[in-house]
Amino acid sequence: VQYAQTVDKDDPVISCPFAYNRIFFGAPGTGKSYLLEEQRKKYFASPERYERVTFHPDYSYANFVGTYKPVPLKNEAGESIITYAYVPGPFMRIYVEALKHPDKIYLLALEEINRANVAAVFGDVFQLLDRDDDGNSMYPIHASEDMKCYIAKELGEEPNKISSIRIPANMYIWATMNSADQGVFPMDTAFKRRWEFEYIGINTSEQQMSHYNVQFGQG
């Protein structure tokens, strides 16, 4: 969050020795999700410090970031009523947690990222993927009124103190991607350049699984 008055950029944050925006890619079955999960358990072990979501063709910006939705409630008389509220998606939930706890690192894990139209899913959040040397978003985006109210409520601030948002340096986004599969969406160059790609091949997968012993039945 960028406040309308001042922003303290000197708050120290801890980190892990990997890229902030990272995609594990390779053929299906090569262990991409396994490797991501092993590193997740090492650096983001607490359940409240990560969220995992699987992309699919119908996944949208509203699912990923958040949107205004009807929410059922009970009034004082105990009657069911429908009201509307901003319902955050996994991106916004992890983003807010990272802002609340700048001394901890948080992970958003995106499985099968290219099974959705990433340009549509990320929307204006796409601009936040450019990070500076400290890991913060280089360029802020304008926060909608609904988003401002939600963030302000979570942080105990006034909405008018929030003018824009940036991804903080303690928030990591890692993803898996099938490079040879049907039913996937292409990624444009502008999107790709904002990520560090790590190829997971057959040999890499074999090395990851080398410490397991597999016993076959007799007879």
Where in this protein do the model-derived segments appear?
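C-terminal regulatory/interaction module of P-loop NTP-utilizing enzymes
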Residues: 1-219
